[in-house]
Amino acid sequence: MAKKRESPKLIKIKDAIKLINQQVSLIGIVLEQREPKQCRNNDWICTLRIIDDTYPSPGLTVNVFSKTLEQLPQIKNHDDMILFTRIKMQTFDSGERVNAACSRWVSSFALFEGVDFVCYQCSTNFHEEEALYKSAMDDLRKVFAGCSQVIKAMQSISYRTKPCSEVFSFLREIKIGKRFDLVCRILHADEDTSAVFVWDGTDAPPASILAKRSEEDKAFSSLSVHTLLSRDVLLSFPTVGTILRVHLSSHLFYRVKPGDWVKLYHLLCEVDRGSWVIKVTSSTKVHHLAQDDRLVEKIMRIYDKRLSSKLGHISFWCFPSPPGLTETDDNCAPFVTLMDIITFPKVTCKYRCIVRVVAAYPWQVEDFCSDENRRHHQVLLTLEDSTATLEAFLCNKDAEYFWGLGFQDTETLRKKRNWLLGIRESSNFVAPRNPPWIECCILSYYTNKADPWNTRLYRIFGTRLLH
């Protein structure tokens, strides 16, 4: 009969640091997790700092080794506990300091969360009976129960690469060509994790549109998030706040998943076809944050306060509303964002929103009418707010009401179109356009009853341009 494997005896960190070159087993609260690195032998290492009631400061540094990135500890929350077995205590810095090594051959670990200490990750060689350690975890939790704010403060400091030197920007503060650091939520990651979509609840500033006149006759090509992802994916996204795409090397996003909060360091913003594009630099880094990190909580407080406001679905950049540029027939309907419209659960509905008109197709006002008698008017306008772009038709009576004139006066119509799209009258060459914000009413409808969602379209109605 095989001899039953004995479970290792737990010791406290204060005692462990005295047992140099010996293997120990212990439980601690994770205070810090540093960015993983690849070793020369192609293994991976990440460094954790843990504490217990006997060694709350500065804590014990544990270097965890694994064959792959995915096998490294992936801390989910503040106050999560980690159980290490058979880690080796060792000295460094000429014997002045002590740390521990969690070998992938001999040592093992397990991570626990919640009041019931549910194990959510363990190394492949972890074979201990979890129940044997829950009493020790419960005792440790009770010791720190009244010190959670202190632990959070210590964790907030330890997540900094240089204490008191980090300054994070909101998306509403980005500028062309200026490097910045961002705290954001990952909403979606491509299958190969080469690109992610990020959000922080704020509105990126409207980007100037730079296009040659020869290009204006082409249909507008947008890089808006809704053109890159399916509607099913968009349904899980917030409908307020700008969502931007970030391209990163797959090794930087090796364990990023939707719902994660991260710090992105050393990003760079550019504008492509009127849309913001976030690019990485040679020094870009990704650091994970716990859901209850103070920075995350601050962002969500700001976002929740915005949603509670009647004007929360209006872009920050046109707040409170563009006065006197247009008038609408439905002044009682609440304002919505374009993402609200795109993800609305019904195919047909009426909406009121504040947008910019960033493109018109066809471009020449002489082509707005499709017949010689100039009775049938149709133009496709590309609308934009801080959340998305949306193409909406402006047709016939709705168009005549919108422009406030008949279609015979092409010169006046051209001036109104130029003002609406932010075109400078005197410019014949490449010039940036910055269209004004206008209030408008939009109707969603379908053209095929048998396939309503795939034939869903939009048109502007009940809106009059006053300029």
Curated annotation (Swiss-Prot):
SMART domains: Telo_bind. Changing residue 35 to F: Reduces POT1A function in positive regulation of telomere length; reduces binding affinity for CTC1; has no effect on binding affinity for STN1. One of its GO terms (cellular component) is cytoplasm. Keywords: Chromosome, Cytoplasm, DNA-binding, Nucleus, RNA-binding, Telomere. Its main location: nucleus. One of its GO terms (biological process) is positive regulation of telomere maintenance. Changing residue 65 to A: Almost abolishes POT1A function in positive regulation of telomere length; abolishes telomeric DNA binding. It comes from the Eukaryota. It is found in: Nucleus; Chromosome, Telomere; Nucleus, Nucleolus; Cytoplasm. Changing residue 132 to D: Has no effect on POT1A function in positive regulation of telomere length; has no effect on binding affinity for CTC1. Component of the telomerase holoenzyme complex at least composed of TERT, CBF5 and POT1a. The RNA molecule associated to the telomerase complex, and providing a template for telomeric DNA synthesis, is most likely TR and not TER1 as described previously. Interacts with the N-terminal part of TERT. Interacts with CBF5. Interacts with CTC1 and STN1. Does not interact with TEN1. Belongs to the telombin family. This is Protection of telomeres protein 1a. It comes from Arabidopsis thaliana. The gene is POT1A.
